[in-house]
């Protein structure tokens, strides 16, 4: 049967694979979408394996809270097109839900969780095969407290925060704090929480800045004493 552009576009949206890959898969599968997806998956796994050394700099990061427990997880890929694909985002959400339900302590525990006919890692590998892009779970953190809050930035799936509190906090206030953390990226709750290493680096920067300012002032003073205005030395208005 003839493969139409509408069919190719539909399969591309379903899989995130390239237009030509979708066309070839549909042609080979004689228009059967399920068979075409399987063809793309198998071919894509081989391609993805060759891309193992490539950088996966895009992806989806999501956070979730159950009250006293919160989790953030990141699933990475190579392109923004795949990162925005609904199935890729859903896979990230499904993995997050499993991690929260099982209260996994480490990323390795998450990867080993049962999912579908295999494990979470198998599901990621399958998705990588469908798109032909390198994919990896690369980011996992949990917090626990009397209460927790999360912030997912404007549903963009690229920025989120998780916060744990050691006492009850109004839900709206907790969300606002989580949002402010996303906006300001503070390094500590208060000054006492700033590490000595960070403090020392800031002190060194301040010292170097002060030295530079002192040198500049000394130069300006010396020029002034010699009756030289550095702003006018090269002026075309000067007469010989």
Predicted feature residues:
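N-terminal assembly/interaction segments in proteins that build large macromolecular machines
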Residues: 2-240
């Amino acid at each position: 049967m003839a493969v139409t552009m509408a069919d190719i576009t539909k399969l591309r949206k379903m899989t995130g694979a390239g237009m030509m890959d979708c066309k070839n898969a549909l042609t080979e599968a004689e228009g059967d979408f399920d068979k075409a997806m399987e063809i793309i998956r198998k071919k894509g796994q081989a391609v993805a394996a060759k891309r193992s050394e490539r950088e996966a700099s895009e992806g989806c990061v999501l956070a979730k809270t159950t009250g006293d427990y919160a989790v953030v997880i990141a699933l990475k890929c190579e392109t923004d097109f795949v990162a925005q694909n609904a199935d890729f985002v859903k896979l990230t959400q499904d993995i997050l839900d499993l991690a929260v339900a099982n209260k996994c302590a480490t990323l390795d525990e998450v990867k080993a969780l049962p999912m579908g006919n295999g494990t979470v890692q198998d599901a990621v590998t399958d998705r990588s095969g469908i798109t032909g892009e390198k994919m990896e779970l690369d980011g996992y953190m949990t917090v626990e407290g009397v209460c927790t809050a999360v912030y997912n930035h404007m549903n963009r799936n690229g920025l989120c925060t998780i916060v744990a509190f050691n006492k009850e906090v109004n839900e709206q206030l907790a969300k606002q704090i989580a949002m402010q953390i996303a906006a300001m990226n503070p390094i500590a709750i208060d000054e006492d929480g700033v590490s000595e290493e960070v403090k020392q680096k800031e002190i060194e920067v301040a010292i170097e800045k002060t030295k530079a300012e002192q040198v500049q002032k000394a130069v300006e003073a010396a020029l002034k004493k010699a009756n030289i205005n550095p702003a006018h030395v090269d002026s075309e208005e000067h007469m010989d």
